[in-house]
Amino acid sequence: MSLTIIKGTILSAPTLGQLDALPGGYLVAEDGLIRGVYGSLPEQYAGAPVEDWGDALILQSFADLHLHAPQYPMLGMGMDLPLLDWLNAYAFPTEARFADTGYAREIYSRLARELIANGTTRVCMFSSLHTDATLILMEELEKAGVTGYVGKVNMDRNAAPGLLEETTEESRRETLRWLDACQDFRLVKPMLTPRFTPSCTDELMAFLGKLAAERDLPVQSH
């Protein structure tokens, strides 16, 4: 059993609108699961190593429920444009670069480290349509200790050059290849991700719906 004991000012929000602070409190975790928060260390943990953070605040991490990983290099750009113009001018060209796995590794390793550095440990994340880049993203998140869901985007119509799977069959094939390749991840799991209605044919949506039901997979979209 692995045991972690952290001492500091423990913040918790047991109910909506309630914030509790426990100065000099102890947070005890066994095998990665929090077992309790205590004003004094329980006797069964006496003598165990304690990470003492003094008066530092110990609080829950953040969860980002909608994050487009391949848009990380263009944060804050083009905010003067309406959505579709912004997609065509900034988002789609940036996402197309993730066909390059070397570029994907560079960007996604930085993104994973920055998430952890800023206290975000759980995500629901869009990748691009590139299977290999999506697997790299999952690898980097897992390496950094981020937990959550990642989706290989599906797009088989109405997309910019370089961001369109040539056929619906290719989209199906790459989705299955991705799912087969990511079965061994421990912290990061797959989530089916049709980008949005304009970019997915009815045939593709029917396939993804059937796949979600057969494999009990979650789905995210817009």
Question: What does each of the following model-derived ranges do?
Answer:
Residues 1-2, 47-48, 54, 118-121, ...:
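Short coil/turn connectors at secondary-structure junctions
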Residues 1-45, 57:
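N-terminal metal-binding scaffold of metallo-dependent hydrolase/deaminase domains
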Residues 8, 27, 32, 55, ...:
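Divalent metal-coordination and catalytic microenvironments
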Residues 11, 92-93, 155-158:
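A short, flexible beta-alpha/helix-coil linker loop
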Residues 17-18, 127-128, 162-163:
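Short, solvent-exposed loop/turn segments at secondary-structure boundaries
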Residues 75-146, 170-184:
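Alpha-helical scaffold segments that flank or form the walls of functional sites
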Residues 132-221:
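Metal-coordinating catalytic core of metallo-dependent amide/deamination hydrolases
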